[in-house]
């Protein structure tokens, strides 16, 4: 006999008058006038079970129930009494009159009630098994499953083959740090956990599989943020014999299908924006287009002003000066307060800005006299006129300024733009539009200059193909080279990124030369790829999407940890299992490892 006939949350009026057997957990037990009510919960939801004292043995068992007891119930589905229905749940019109009650397993007192909301993340992650029983987490993980299934169905229908690639691979220290795995068999040598299956999926294209995908774990030993984990799940895809536009069209169709079939959402238009345009207008290569604020370019205007912060930035190599007009920010009633401006000043310092200059436009028609700011006296009339003209500022508006190296300005004022847009002020004043805002960012630079190392590094990775003809600039002017790279952005988050790959060994060698990777180093790190490219490698390209990020966006979760069953903390720890943890001396000896600071391991 089956342990249950139905899920709790799926018992509805359609089963009225039928006997059902349910299994789940006691969410609440309530005593009312000699009758016991049990809210029974499973992954599909709740159902109300009524225990009548007429069945003495069953009722006695019900009296001993506590929260989180695992029980089996057999009973009759009937309508709830008039006035007691609950429209918030699927089973809210019915209840189950209990005939038999079996305790499958009692529970100790839980660390918290499952429906408790104000829990610290430490408590939730330490008691993750209980946390995962909460309907919020169950919904998130069920949605994650549905997204993965939609992706698989779409790719299968389009001829993609699911192929696994190695988890123990070669360390290639480019970009983020690798997680290393010592080899017991090969003394002093290490595997690395993959940061991406990038090279293997390219090899699969050379091998002729034509269309590949996998939903796989990737690992990066980097500082964590709200949208990062040391291990994360990637929807990894590669295809041969497709142009860049065709690849983008295919994957846009995939994401549109996933959102439509799981959320019933139409993502609408996907505008295409160049990297240069995105960073120029929004200070970011993943702009949140729901925020209705844009940069105003002022570098040329500020070169001869007396305010050294502006003229210095405008005159330096790689410097930039921008304005950010905030409509209504200077109004006496409902504008930004002095405290808010001070808070924003501190905020931009996180991104390297030294301060945050501003001008309040009180009465534009009065010219200089209608402007309020400590910096106005250091700006000549022509500069002030140009600022007002370019920003389009009106009475009651406030203009923030960023002046520094271009990267600092873009990062600081770009983050400020997003913060203001998402603030209470921004939403009240129509600076934020509640919608799904997707776009493609294309034409990324091939290289970016690393000031510390004093050499170029790859913007995406060194296997990204340049725009046709741009390989000729790699030796003489690498900063001019544009790649066939592209990112899909949604609501200010990079959902996925990819590129057309280099499929010719001679072009790959030019990229290595531009990155100052010697032939010997290239052969040592990537010899297997260089060899493969010589065997008639096809034109190919692809993308990788962050499954964790997609589901986080869909659920509106505050943290990516809310859509992962067993995540790590921001200190890369698992509070449930207490990983990482010390290992015993015998294991270390087998791996030929001696700790340089054994006391540090004991201290943790």
From Swiss-Prot:
It catalyses: tRNA(Asx) + L-aspartate + ATP = L-aspartyl-tRNA(Asx) + AMP + diphosphate. ATP binds at residues 220-222, 229, 494, 546-549. The gene is aspS. Belongs to the class-II aminoacyl-tRNA synthetase family. Type 1 subfamily. L-aspartate binds at residues 174, 220, 460, 501. It comes from Verminephrobacter eiseniae (strain EF01-2). Aspartyl-tRNA synthetase with relaxed tRNA specificity since it is able to aspartylate not only its cognate tRNA(Asp) but also tRNA(Asn). Reaction proceeds in two steps: L-aspartate is first activated by ATP to form Asp-AMP and then transferred to the acceptor end of tRNA(Asp/Asn). Its main location: cytoplasm. This is Aspartate--tRNA(Asp/Asn) ligase. GO terms for cellular component: cytoplasm. The lineage of its organism: Bacteria, Pseudomonadati, Pseudomonadota, Betaproteobacteria, Burkholderiales.
